[in-house]
Amino acid sequence: MKFILPLFTSLPVALAWLPGIDKDIYSAAGTNIFNVTSASSKRWLPASKKIRGVNLGSHFVIEPWMASMAWSNMGCSGQRSEFDCVMALGQETADQAFADHWGSWITQDDINQMVQYGLNTIRIPVGYWLKEDLVYADSEHFPKGGIGYLEDVCGWASDAGMYIIIDLHGAPGAQQPKQPFTGQYAPNPGFYQDYQYDRALEFLEWMTTSIHQNNKFRNVGMLEIVNEPVQNADQASSMINSYYPSAFTRIRNTESSLGITSNNYLHIQMMNEKWGSGDPTQSLTDNYFAAYDDHRYVKWDSSVAVDKESYISASCVDDRGGNWPTIVGEWSLSVPDNVEHTADWEPSSNTDFYARWFAAQAIAYEKQEGWVFWSWKAQLGDYRWSYKDAVDAGVIPKDLDSIYDYSPC
């Protein structure tokens, strides 16, 4: 998905901006958290200054499985998605409930703690319904008022010197069936139609304009045009051949109309070919500004034997290359559901294993452009999905460079 010194020495000069390459980014206090040596050196140093980030999961697109207490406190118990909750509560009550959630799930203290833990990037999942005039008032039900809270989070992260990826996590019509991460529990994916692509493209234009014109978005350098589409190349063919190139054209035309110079363009991110939706570059005429997202959940890889040494070994040799540049934008320490609570895998008594496995995965993903863990926090009582809890448990070190001292491989 994005950035490292070789990326910028081998490509043409007109490039999307990346921190420490095209321009440095600083916290409000003047600190450059990507550069620990000097202001003039390149940011991405092997084993030190790759992308190291966390997802703000369940902030703007709530997934009830990982935020059950918050979901219940909002009055949404028993509802499967944001769409269902808003429909059940009614618009006015839902808007207040969601505003309370947005104001408390991720705070400025969280952002500051991320920096203290050595993180330099956040990925923010959002839904198309942030642009409220895209929502069909007679048939769609989503909370209103989220954009101001997105501005706040991006402002805090920019003030802290962090890099920001905004990800279209919930697409019009839903890009996957029966998945709350789309914002609705649709029986079938309705995204793969021209009129839905048009709505998504309008969202991307609006988001691009907001990023370039609102100072709180100043450290947003990447816009992902859809998260986790269907893993079926035939079903996704119109997305690859129509929506992707149209997204590039519409985003670049928007930037040109705003007078944005090429070194300040956004990176445009797509799921990589490993995801299974097809080759994202197939119909692109210019991919110099492209970046790629890889989601690596070993727990769902049936080719890896379910024992600790196999998990470590698989991660040690895990090559996430292919489309380039790639960031591993989602991963975790979770293991298969049928063993996750057994003695061999129970979190509290196996911290040494999970620390080794975290190191093995992070080192592998830093052979690409870095990683973004899913997620910063969860309400599962299980650090395998919660970066914050894993640090508290001693599984993830605050000094992330020390993972190379673990020698897990």
From Swiss-Prot:
Disulfide links within the chain: none
Pfam family, one: Cellulase
GO cellular component terms, semicolon-separated: extracellular region
Alphabetical list of InterPro entries matching this protein: Glyco_hydro_5, Glycoside_hydrolase_SF, Glycosyl_hydrolase_5
The UniProt record lists the keyword Cell wall biogenesis/degradation: yes
UniProt EC number: 3.2.1.75
GO BP annotations, alphabetical order: cell wall organization; glucan catabolic process
Catalytic machinery residues: 228, 330
Subcellular location, principal: secreted
Catalytic activity: Random hydrolysis of (1->6)-linkages in (1->6)-beta-D-glucans
Cellular localisation: Secreted
Gene3D superfamilies given in the database record: Glycosidases (3.20.20.80)
UniProt key word Signal: yes
Glycan attachment residues as annotated in the record: 35
Signal peptide stretch: 1-16
UniProt function note: Beta-glucanases participate in the metabolism of beta-glucan, the main structural component of the cell wall. Acts on lutean, pustulan and 1,6-oligo-beta-D-glucosides.
Protein name (Swiss-Prot/TrEMBL): Glucan endo-1,6-beta-glucosidase B
Organism, as annotated: Emericella nidulans (strain FGSC A4 / ATCC 38163 / CBS 112.46 / NRRL 194 / M139) (Aspergillus nidulans)
